Design a protein with these regions (language model features):
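P-loop NTP-binding module
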Residues: 1-227
Length: 227
């Protein structure tokens, strides 16, 4: 999986792959997309969880920009906000929706009421919706399985933003429901033992780790490897 170069923090609404499509960072996102495609030559990967070991590692910004570069490739993308505890994915696309994943899984809304077209070509968003009292139970429900089955008929690729692996069980619950997982770590912040622990947890949950994205890489430093 590709490693990022160092990049300055951007406002949440600033999607660099959309705003600066010729930038070096955007090219790194395209490299990540290519690596994901290479991993799916024999086993077609259509649903991908993007998560992290800890909060603040950049998973949500990473998944949003991945959605953009897949959309730029002409693929119809569904981005699902499955971080039901601290949902922020909708902020990056400046979308405010009354319906989202929690409304769908709790039977309060239909699928098409919960999917919105973003301003970016080919990219659709299902926001998290209202914060529920039982996130893990909703994500492990039959409704989540049915959502994925329906989405496979409508979209080329499904990207799912989840809470950090070490914080709660949500990513583990979804791990074996999806085709692959991308783990985001932040350079000089995420501790090595936490990365190893996160991988062990995902392996135990029968998840397929596609690779690790190293975020905020400083030039001149030795690069991390990836799983």
């Amino acid at each position: 999986m590709s490693m990022f170069g160092r990049k300055k923090r951007k406002p949440l609404r600033q999607l660099i792959t959309h705003k600066e499509p010729k930038s070096r960072v955007t090219e790194q996102y395209r490299n990540i997309r290519t690596n994901i495609e290479f991993t799916s030559v024999d086993n077609h990967v259509r649903s991908i969880i993007v998560t992290s070991a800890d909060p603040g590692d950049g998973k949500t910004t990473t998944i949003a920009n991945l959605a953009v570069v897949f959309g730029q490739q002409g693929k119809k993308v569904l981005l699902i906000g499955a971080d039901l505890r601290k949902p922020t994915i909708q902020n990056l696309f400046a979308i405010h929706s009354s319906n989202g994943l929690t409304n769908l899984l709790s039977g309060q809304a239909k699928l098409m009421q919960c999917i919105q077209k973003t301003d970016i070509e080919n990219v659709h968003l299902m926001a998290a919706g209202p914060i529920p009292p039982n996130p893990a139970e909703l994500l492990s429900s039959r409704g989540m399985d049915e959502l994925l089955l329906e989405a496979y008929n409508m979209f080329d690729i499904i990207l799912i933003d989840t809470p950090p692996v070490l914080a709660v069980t949500d990513a583990q619950i979804l791990a074996n429901k999806c085709d692959g997982i991308v783990l985001v770590v932040r350079s000089e912040k995420t501790e090595k033992d936490k990365i190893v622990k996160a991988k062990q947890i995902l392996d135990k949950a029968s998840g397929k780790l596609l690779g690790v994205v190293l975020n905020d890489k400083r030039e001149g430093k030795e690069q991390y490897g990836y799983y």
